[in-house]
């Protein structure tokens, strides 16, 4: 039995965590008796609902609600997991457009990170390691991941595709040459990205559990 909180903090949210007290968390655990709890830590808007040092904390955070959840769940032997938005990160797309996937019109996608770019190494992995190491969280459920991947027309991605396949350009329509190869190239890019962060966490924090929502399903 588990509890899943799916908050998705935004820049406009205020007093995040103001009512998250040890007494409140204990009351929930005593009433529900869950085996695990999953709380939000970074939703699709890209803001973190705890005072992260490596990510982008929401401006309306009060205290450290994640620390409260971890301390009380640990005292009661209840596993604590976090919801983490992977490919979807609107804040990062706005602040670091070079991290985003590029649409066919040459503009950065407003929400989808490039699975070929530095986002995984510069934000995703460091933040998951912060959660595992600094907070002692048991694992992360990565949402907004495989189902959010888009065809990436970034210049470097297209050059790599052309070198890999011999195509002269990236196809834009299903009737264009190399369309299936283009889709599969982007799918494989996601698989490489997924393996990269799973392997990184297993290397540094082997007990930290990682799951990517809808991975290896019909959404992938």
Residue positions per predicted region:
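A cross-domain feature marking catalytic cores of carbohydrate-active enzymes
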Residues: 5-7, 39-43, 82-86, 144, ...
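Aromatic-lined carbohydrate-binding/catalytic grooves of carbohydrate-active enzymes
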Residues: 30-65, 88-109, 151-156
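Substrate-binding cleft/loops of secretory-pathway carbohydrate-active enzymes
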Residues: 90-99, 141, 148-152, 190, ...
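N-terminal structural segment of carbohydrate-active enzymes
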Residues: 1-45, 76-78
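Conserved, mostly hydrophobic/aromatic
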Residues: 29, 73, 80, 124, ...
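Short, well-ordered coil/turn segments that N-cap beta-strands
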Residues: 1, 33-35, 74-80, 136-138, ...
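The substrate-binding groove and active-site-proximal loops of carbohydrate-active enzymes
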Residues: 4-20, 48-63, 107-125, 175-193, ...
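Active-site-adjacent "subsite" loops/lids of carbohydrate-active enzymes
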Residues: 82-135, 144, 166-183, 195
């Amino acid at each position: 039995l588990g509890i899943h909180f799916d908050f998705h903090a935004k820049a406009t949210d205020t007093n995040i965590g103001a009512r998250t007290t040890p007494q409140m968390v204990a009351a929930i655990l005593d009433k529900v008796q869950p085996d695990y709890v999953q709380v939000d830590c970074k939703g699709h808007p890209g803001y973190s609902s705890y005072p992260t040092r490596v990510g982008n904390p929401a401006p309306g955070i009060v205290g450290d609600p994640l620390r409260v959840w971890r301390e009380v769940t640990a005292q009661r032997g209840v596993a604590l997991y976090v919801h983490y938005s992977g490919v979807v990160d609107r804040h990062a797309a706005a602040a670091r457009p070079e991290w985003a996937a590029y649409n066919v019109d040459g503009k950065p996608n407003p929400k989808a990170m490039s699975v070929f770019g530095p986002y995984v190494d510069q934000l995703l992995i460091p933040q998951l390691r912060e959660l595992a190491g600094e907070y002692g969280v048991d694992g992360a459920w990565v949402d907004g991941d495989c189902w959010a991947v888009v065809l990436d027309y970034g210049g470097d991605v297209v050059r790599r595709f052309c070198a890999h396949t011999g195509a002269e350009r990236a196809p834009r329509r299903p009737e264009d040459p190399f369309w299936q190869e283009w889709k599969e190239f982007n799918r494989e890019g996601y698989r490489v990205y997924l393996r990269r962060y799973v392997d990184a966490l297993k290397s540094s924090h082997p007990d930290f559990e990682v799951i990517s929502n809808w991975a290896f399903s019909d959404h992938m």
